[in-house]
Amino acid sequence: MPQIQSSHSNHFDFTIDTADRTKLLMSYLVVPTTANFNNVMHGGELLNLLDKVAYVCSTRYCAKGTVTLSVDGVTFKYPIPVGNLLTFLASINYVGNTSCEVGIKVLSEDIKTREITHTNSCYFTMVAVENGKPTPMPKYEPKTEVEIRRYEGALKRKEMRTRGYLKSGKHEGV
């Protein structure tokens, strides 16, 4: 199967087999219509894109429509200037009965200097829906060390959500 891999191994430890429905790579060029007065991407625009990435990743995985249930801890670490190329690295980290966790890592590349900055990471909980009601998702079994690490991190976050709190801080496993 065709695979996608980056030459920026220190930032982009993400290999995608195009037949693997648990991972997604999407890119977006930051344009002036998405910017605020400081000529950097507006946070709301980024949130909108993150929601779309989570939707595409989860829908592609389960072959059903999905809706956003929650988003955990989006931190805006660095501004994203107009003209930069965003790369969204998304993965299915955990699947329950009708929902899944999608982890997303955002990289911003200055096209002129080729400098890459990890600007954001977050976790979306997406629910599979048919006819307005939650519906079962296909089972997921992590296979690689990275997938197992992400899965275990997702279980911890699920437990924290169940208890009604979620610690902010380092996003593991994206």
UniProtKB/Swiss-Prot annotation:
One Gene Ontology term, aspect cellular component: cytoplasm
InterPro entries hit by this protein: Cytosol_ACT, HOTDOG_ACOT, HotDog_dom_sf, Thioestr_dom
Entries under Pfam families matching the protein: 4HBT (PF03061)
GO MF term (any one): long-chain fatty acyl-CoA hydrolase activity
GO biological process: acyl-CoA metabolic process
Keyword Hydrolase set for record: yes
Span of domain HotDog ACOT-type: 20-132
Record keywords: Hydrolase
Presence of keyword Hydrolase: yes
Entry similarity comment: Belongs to the acyl coenzyme A hydrolase family.
Name assigned to this protein: Protein VdlD
Species the sequence originates in: Helicobacter pylori (strain ATCC 700392 / 26695) (Campylobacter pylori)
